[in-house]
From Swiss-Prot:
Molecular functions (GO terms): ATP binding; glucose-1-phosphate adenylyltransferase activity
Protein's name in the database: Glucose-1-phosphate adenylyltransferase
Assembly and oligomerization: Homotetramer.
Catalytic activity: alpha-D-glucose 1-phosphate + ATP + H(+) = ADP-alpha-D-glucose + diphosphate
PROSITE patterns (UniProt xref): ADP_GLC_PYROPHOSPH_1, ADP_GLC_PYROPHOSPH_2
Binding site residues for alpha-D-glucose 1-phosphate: Y101, G166, E181, K182, S192
Species this chain originates from: Bacillus anthracis
One Pfam assignment: Hexapep_GlmU
Protein family membership: Belongs to the bacterial/plant glucose-1-phosphate adenylyltransferase family.
Pathway participation: Glycan biosynthesis; glycogen biosynthesis
GO biological process assignments: glycogen biosynthetic process
The organism's place on the tree of life at top rank: Bacteria
Length: 376
């Protein structure tokens, strides 16, 4: 029998991330590189470690190999524990065949046995594809104080963007009275962040109920949460005010990387009290040549810079040759940029080779972002 845990986290990391185009052709979205040395999933795993959540089940499905290799036994996030720690939970085969996860609720339902072994009081459900720093222990305290059945973390979004999100309509006490999935005419701008805390008994009961319903799409937002509301359960909205970014598109991924270069950013990677952990790439120090010029940029280990880099994020092992300019761009691990190249407002994928004299910038709309990656 596993050691009893007060709260167990379940991290949904099986997303395809199709809006990221070629970046996720052979890679699960949570494994996409971010911020010069991280992967998207590092933020959620680091939040767990910093919040004192010591038992994390990671549910994978789409293109899982590189993500599995990256996570390993969880030692990068201090989650390699004798009891608990990180457990990767891909779909598994039964006598009737492989049981694929058909939705977010289905993924958790198929792993109820994993949760049961810990006899948790609470289950924290997370998404592995957002960029943010959050103390989950404060949300758990709120959930307990409010005597909620379910608590959902929400963030205020601009009204003109509210129709892109699952929106929570609440009363004055922040109790959720209605949940609307991407409403055309939203009545609130409190968007669900896809972070839920359930009382374990409630979660188990309603996932089993959802699984028995042949009409259900087995999704928390579309099926389980509306059912809980219909049956009068107490759902509380937990307001979050920090930095949070859904990096589900090429442009939003680029924007989040550019946010790291601001003088005043609420996503401070230098915060010693809330570190973001990652797997060390074991590269040599970066080299900046005498004639190179670097301004307002994040340059990671193993880079060789002989040209100009301005307001950009370069991952490990990137080469920028003489006469080249990289401006307002993100260059992913191992990319080689030849001589006299101009790259502006672009994301260059991992291991890409940009030939001498190439010019890459938005052609029509100057606000666009260009993606150069395998398969494009």
């Amino acid at each position: 029998m596993a050691q009893k845990q007060k709260c167990v986290a379940m991290l949904l990391a099986g997303g395809k991330g199709s809006r990221l185009s070629a970046l996720t052709k052979n890679l699960a979205k949570p494994a996409v590189p971010f911020g010069g040395k991280y992967r998207i999933i590092d933020f959620t795993l680091s939040n767990c470690a910093n919040s004192g959540i010591e038992t994390v089940g990671i549910l994978t499905q789409y293109q899982p190999l590189e993500l599995h290799n990256y996570i390993g036994i969880g030692n990068a996030w201090d989650l390699d524990r004798v009891s608990g720690g990180v457990t990767v939970l891909p779909p598994y085969a039964e006598s009737s065949g492989v049981k694929w996860y058909t939705g977010t609720a289905s993924a958790i339902y198929q792993n109820l046995n994993y949760l049961s072994q810990y006899e948790p009081e609470y289950v924290l459900i997370l998404s592995g594809d957002h960029i943010y720093k959050m103390d989950y222990s404060k949300m758990l305290d709120y959930h307990i104080e409010k005597e909620a059945d379910v608590s959902i973390s929400v963030i205020e979004v601009p009204w003109d963007e509210a129709s892109r999100f699952g929106i929570m309509n609440t009363n004055e006490e922040m109790e959720i009275v209605e949940f609307e999935e991407k409403p055309q005419f939203p009545r609130s701008n409190l968007a669900s962040m896809g972070i839920y805390i359930f009382n374990w008994a409630i979660l188990k009961e309603y996932l089993e109920m959802d699984a028995r319903n042949p009409e259900s799409s087995n999704d928390f937002g579309k099926d389980v949460l509306p059912l809980l509301l219909d049956e009068g359960k107490k759902l509380m909205a937990y307001p979050f005010e920090g930095y949070w970014k859904d990096v589900g598109t090429v442009k939003s991924l680029w924007e989040a990387n550019m946010d790291l270069l601001r003088d005043e950013t609420s996503l401070n990677l230098n915060d010693r009290d809330w570190r973001i952990y990652s797997v060390n790439p074991n590269e040599p120090p970066q080299y900046i040549a005498e004639k190179a010029k670097v301004e307002e940029s994040l340059i990671n280990e193993g880079c060789v810079i002989e040209g100009d880099v301005k307001h950009s994020v370069l991952f490990q092992g990137v080469t920028v040759e003489e006469g080249s300019m990289v401006i307002d761009s993100v260059v992913m691990p191992g990319a080689k940029i030849g001589k006299n190249v101009v790259i502006e407002r672009a994301i260059v994928g991992s291991e890409m080779v940009i030939e001498d004299g190439t010019i890459i910038r938005p052609e029509k709309n100057v606000d666009d972002v260009v993606l150069i990656a395998e398969g494009k």
